[in-house]
Amino acid sequence: MSSDSNISVEEDLKDLLKRCPPGTFEAAVAFRKNKDASYVEKIVMGIIDRHLEPDQREILANSDDMLRMYEDLGMDSLTMLEVVMLVEQTLQVSIDNEELRDLRTIGDVKAYLSAKARGEKPPT
């Protein structure tokens, strides 16, 4: 990749992730450069955080992988769609709507997207 295209990718990511918490943008740039799936969790958590209210952000920050997206974080289907679209753009993956229905917890989301980022079949 040329220097100009690297700058363009970084500018695009910076715009996409502008309201995400610190570290999200940097993880996305690193992921795009080397496709290392270890960055996926930081990216996904940052994108989810961006779409939450302040009290929900605290719940997310102090929880484990069993935290439920809808029940515990109060996410609705529109918010989930916004999260999915931003994750797809950032990670350059496609998320199947049928598989999306099975993602209930933060752990489900992280495992699914980490597998997608590695080019593996996601867990069912």
Language model features with spans:
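Thiotemplate assembly-line natural product biosynthesis machinery
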Residues: 4-61, 119-124
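Glycine-rich loop motifs involved in handling phospho/adenylate chemistry
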Residues: 32, 60-76, 96-105
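Short alpha-helical elements of helix-turn-helix
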Residues: 42, 78-81
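Generic structural marker for isolated residues within well-ordered, non-membrane alpha-helices
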Residues: 45, 66, 84
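Phosphopantetheinylated carrier protein domains
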Residues: 80-103, 123
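Hydrophobic recognition helices of helix-based DNA-binding modules
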Residues: 91, 113-117
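Short, cationic-aromatic polyanion-contact patches
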Residues: 104-114
